[in-house]
Each structure stands twice: as C-alpha cells, then as structure tokens.
C-alpha cells in the first residue's frame, strides 16, 4: 500500500541541511515533476520490484574482491584487463558501501544539501589515485556495453561517486570501471546454477554537470509550483491519462 511520506521532506524555510541521495539526483534527471512530488510533497513513485538476483551478484562480487583486498593483491580480472591497481583497503569501506545508513557524504554549502551515495567498490593505483568501481549484472545475448540511452544513468552514477570522493579530499581518477556479470543463456540445462561471464568495462567520467544540477534541484525545491513533467516520463504520462479518463467519465 502506498503512503504519503510525512518526514524527510524539503522545507524552504528550514535551516537544517537536507539530504539528497544519488538515486534522488537521478530521479530529478529523469523527471523534475516526479522528483518534486517525492522530495517536496511526499508523493513517491510506486516502488519497483527488487532485483534480488542482481543483489546476490553484487554481494558475491564484493566478497570475492574483499579476499584480494585483505591480501593487498589485484583480482585476476584486473590482471586480465591490464589494470594496475588493487582493491582499496580503508577503515570506512563498509560505511561507504552502506547507502541506506550512511554511504559517502558531502555537505554542499551553496544549497545546504548533504549529498550521499553508496559505492560498490574502490580500487587504488600505484600513484594513490582512487578508482571508482560499480558492479552490474544482466543476462543478454551478444556484447555487453554501456552504450544504450538508458545506461546514461549508470554513467551519471559513476560520476557522482567520483565527485563525492573528490569532495572528501581524495585524489580520484577520471577513469572508472564497471564490473559486468552477464548470465549465460546458452547452457543446455539449468542444473540448479546460473553461470556468468564477467568482464570489465572502462569509463571516463566527467562530473562537470553536478554543481549546476544541484543548484537546479535547489531552485526547483524552493519553488511553490510543481514543475512540468519530462515528456518521456511514463509515470506522469500514466497519471495524466488516468486523470483525463476519470474526468471524462466522471
């Protein structure tokens, strides 16, 4: 059952810092109207179904890379792709990963926002530069890449993490990596197990858009009028269509 959120909403008159997660920034990018309804008025989109298999892959990859983190050696995949780095060992690693409770945070003074995000992994190269890593899982025939329009959200996700770590005083490489697990669909039988091909995809991030976007978010939230919907927003299209039918038939 959907409920209106009464807490953690933006109040233009409040002087308390307001938390904005990486996922909410992405929601703003998808549709300013949905974002405003969510963060200002407490009306969220219906929740999507959890991708439990993807979560399982994330957990197992983290465990696997943690073995090499403890040994301070590169993972075999890093060697295969010629990546001169090792998984970063840091006392805050688990905190940075925990997007629900804390994650990595930064207070953005111009907006009075606290920006938060939970990273999958961080590697470090011999120069001490951090490399942001994100785990992804899919099951498709053909080459896995990050070239589809809908995968722009993956790229923005990477760039926000890079920005957050820089704002926390770390030297961060513009190069990040997606560790992509692709479920095999060409096996003769399931046999109670799902096998994956795992590859690493390099991505050159550019976080120049973030400061401007945060200012736009602040301006939108501070206004008393609901912004226009993104014309491609399926949630708003459904809402508007349902409303027009109800008014017509009512």
Regions found by a protein language model. Name each.
Residues 55-56, 152, 201, 227:
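Residue-level detector of secondary-structure boundary/capping sites
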Residues 1, 10-14, 19-20, 164-250:
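Metal-dependent nuclease catalytic regions and adjoining charged, substrate-binding loops involved
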Residues 1-129:
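Metal-dependent nuclease catalytic cores that hydrolyze phosphodiester bonds in DNA/RNA
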Residues 98-212:
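Mg2+/Mn2+-dependent nuclease catalytic core
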Residues 47-49, 143-149, 224:
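Short, polar/flexible loop-turn hinges at active-site or ligand-entry regions and domain interfaces
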Residues 36-37, 44-46, 140-143, 184-188, ...:
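Short catalytic/ligand-binding loop motif for oxyanion handling, primarily in non-cytosolic enzymes
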């Amino acid at each position: 059952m959907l409920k209106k959120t009464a807490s953690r909403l933006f109040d233009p008159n409040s002087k308390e810092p307001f938390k904005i997660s990486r996922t909410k920034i992405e929601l703003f990018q998808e549709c300013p109207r949905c974002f405003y309804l969510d963060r200002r008025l407490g009306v969220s989109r219906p929740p999507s179904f959890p991708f439990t298999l993807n979560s399982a892959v994330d957990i197992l990859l983290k465990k696997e890379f943690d073995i090499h983190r403890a040994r301070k050696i590169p993972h075999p995949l890093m060697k295969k792709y010629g990546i001169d780095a090792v998984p970063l060992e840091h006392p805050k690693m688990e905190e940075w990963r925990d997007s629900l409770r804390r994650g990595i945070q930064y207070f953005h003074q111009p907006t009075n926002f606290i920006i938060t995000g939970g990273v999958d992994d961080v590697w470090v190269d011999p120069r001490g530069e951090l490399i942001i890593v994100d785990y992804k899982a899919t099951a498709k025939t053909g080459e896995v890449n990050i070239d589809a329009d809908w995968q722009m959200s993956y790229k923005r996700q990477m760039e926000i993490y890079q920005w957050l770590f820089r704002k926390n005083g770390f030297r961060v490489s513009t190069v990040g990596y997606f560790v992509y697990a692709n479920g095999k669909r060409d096996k003769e039988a399931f046999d109670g197990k799902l096998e994956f091909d795992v590859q690493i995809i390099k991505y050159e991030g550019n976080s120049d858009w973030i400061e401007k976007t945060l200012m736009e978010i602040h301006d939108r939230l501070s206004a008393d009028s609901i912004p226009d919907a993104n014309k491609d927003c399926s949630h708003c299209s459904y809402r508007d269509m349902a409303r027009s039918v109800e008014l017509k038939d009512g």
